[in-house]
Amino acid sequence: MLSTRKATVAVVTFLVAAAAAGCTSGSATEASTVGAREPGCPAVLAEAQQAVKAAEDINAPWSGPTRGPDAVPGKTIAYVAQTMTNPGVSGVAKGVQEAAEVIGWDVRTFDGEGTPAGIRNAFAEALALKPSGIVIGGFDPAAAAGQAERAGAAGIPLIGWHATPAPGPSTDPELFTNVTTRVEEVAEISADWIIARSEGHAGVVLFTDASIPFAKRKSDLIRKRLAACSDVELLSLQDIPIPEANTRTVDEVTSLQSRLGDRWTYSAAINDLYFDHAAPALRAAGHKGDGAPFNIGAGDGDPSAFERINGKRYQAATVPEPLSEQGWQIVDEFNRAFAGEPASGYVAPVHITTADNSGGALSWDSEGYRQAYRKIWDR
């Protein structure tokens, strides 16, 4: 990955005084904040500004593990990918491969090609390898429940990446640990960026995929945090399933622009890809790439999102996953499992990438993670 910097973010405690309300029409929910709250939400604005400043920091020290077992030799890891066309899944796979070379292990990748049958077949191929450990790369283990049970019966530890909504160990499904950022923190900092950048005065469109519980929860949390600021108005909640984003987003954005006009000043989306598809419609409407609506993706932060941000092309910010770093963490967690130790418990802090702090990079990872894991493994 091209960037190895990081930022820590303060966890902001807040009270939501009122919720957004509205009516549903087709795929969109029109909504606005209600209730008597202090104009401009000065207290919430101050919290948001502090959180965003911390999340945009690129020089914070490594906050991950510094102690653990030496490298356990002679292991083979199978990486079962939901689909290698997903930039997040493939980015983590590259991190696993890189870390495995350092620790002295072999890695095989099995591509599920994005279908339930493909995932089950890939998992079955991984089991046939009789690996030391298996990575659940970006899918719910329930999609391959039979294979996961066989792995457990064979004593093969499973580690997930985005396999469950929460980070850490899981008993149902049975995972040694699950590597992901906390959805609550990603959602809150995305909303805080809008509140802080707009100084508490924004008209927001929120893009989600309500068919995915994890995505819906993320957008619900973003909506809840935005509602804490009386002068931030949720203009529309757009429910566009991710598989349909490439065919529906342009028409939806064109309709939004016609209906909302200059009231629409900010957007948030549960995945950066919505802004890739929104760009042509915004361009056709005469919007400048670095102008309103200012868009933030609460998604993986894939290279195409970084390209849009660096080029100031209809996306101003993203909350990226540290993909390579998470690949290294997965290898470290396996090493702990093989050594009979518990999971590290580490969860990467959220970070906000903008054109001002990206340095032209196409990814984000914490500063010093490679050195930290090498030291732990004595490699």
Please name every model-derived segment.
Residues 1-28, 96:
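Secretory targeting and sorting signals
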Residues 24, 31-75, 322-379:
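Hinge/cleft segment of the Venus flytrap/periplasmic-binding protein
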Residues 77, 81, 86, 96-98, ...:
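An alpha-beta-alpha
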Residues 83-87, 113-115, 140-143, 164-168, ...:
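Solvent-exposed loop/turn segments at secondary-structure junctions
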Residues 101-112, 175, 203-206, 226-246, ...:
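Short beta-strand elements in bilobed, periplasmic/extracellular small-molecule ligand-binding domains
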